[in-house]
Amino acid sequence: MYDREEEMKKFIILISIYNDWKSVFKLIENIDLQIIDWDAVVSILIVNDASTEDRPKTELNLKKIKSVRIINMKKNRGHARCNAVGLKFLSEKEDFDYIILMDGDGEDRPEELTLLFNKSKENPLKTVTANRKKRSEGPFFKFLYQSHKVLAYILTGKLIKFGNYVCLPKIFAAKLAKQACIWSSFSGTVAKIISDSDRTSVASIKGKRYFGPSKMSFFDLLIHSFSIIAVFRRTTIVRSTLFLIFYLFFVFSNLSIITLL
């Protein structure tokens, strides 16, 4: 008997969450609505980062999504490590063609999934990133975020415009899963390991959380910056040394005799 699913591409959407079950269930329902016309088999894997809130008993009436599974972390490890665990698990255990990573709070808008899907069909061997062209936070946080991007660019030489919202072909998902730096920063590892020629992008608008205010604080943003920089630690050391040498040369070359006295 002919099985059309056998010919379809297999997409797995990887979502990491912590104490945000209400949001992730709403996200799954919205994903199901957005992908209804996809010519693909779609399933979801949730990595639960040792949530302390009980998972509600929710009946999901899904028309397109084939399955929803959950991996439970024994200890809270943070978003980056949950993504790393999910990538490693899927690369070693599952049959798929693409993995799409998403945040579980609604800030990665499911309305943009079809943009990623269509772009991956046009470029089947390339990683597709959702590059932010607009953010939803207030002006102060936007200023801090732009400062973070500039700092990361100065120290790493990489202008990273994307976060976790990325579509990975299987070959690159498996490659990333083997990198030690994936445990520090997903976006930093993508920028380091996957060359510009192997990446393409779609324009993305950061959405608003489904429930409650944004959980990213100034401290979280600092950790995020340092995590990306840590991925490029050798480059950072070299660039920092060169900047220091240039600065000292500039300072000493402009010292006057009066200053020396």
Q: Over which residues does each language-model region extend?
A:
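Acceptor/aglycone-binding surface of glycosyltransferases and processive sugar-polymer synthases
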Residues: 73-75, 79-89, 98-101, 107-184, ...
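A conserved acidic beta->alpha catalytic loop
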Residues: 48-57, 106-107
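Short, Lys/Arg-enriched N-terminal segments with co-localized hydrophobic residues
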Residues: 1-7
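Catalytic donor/gating beta->alpha subdomain of glycosyltransferases that bind UDP-sugars
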Residues: 174-236
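Membrane-embedded multi-pass helical conduit in multi-pass membrane proteins
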Residues: 237-261
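Cell-envelope/extracellular polymer assembly enzymes that use nucleotide-activated donors
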Residues: 10-12, 43
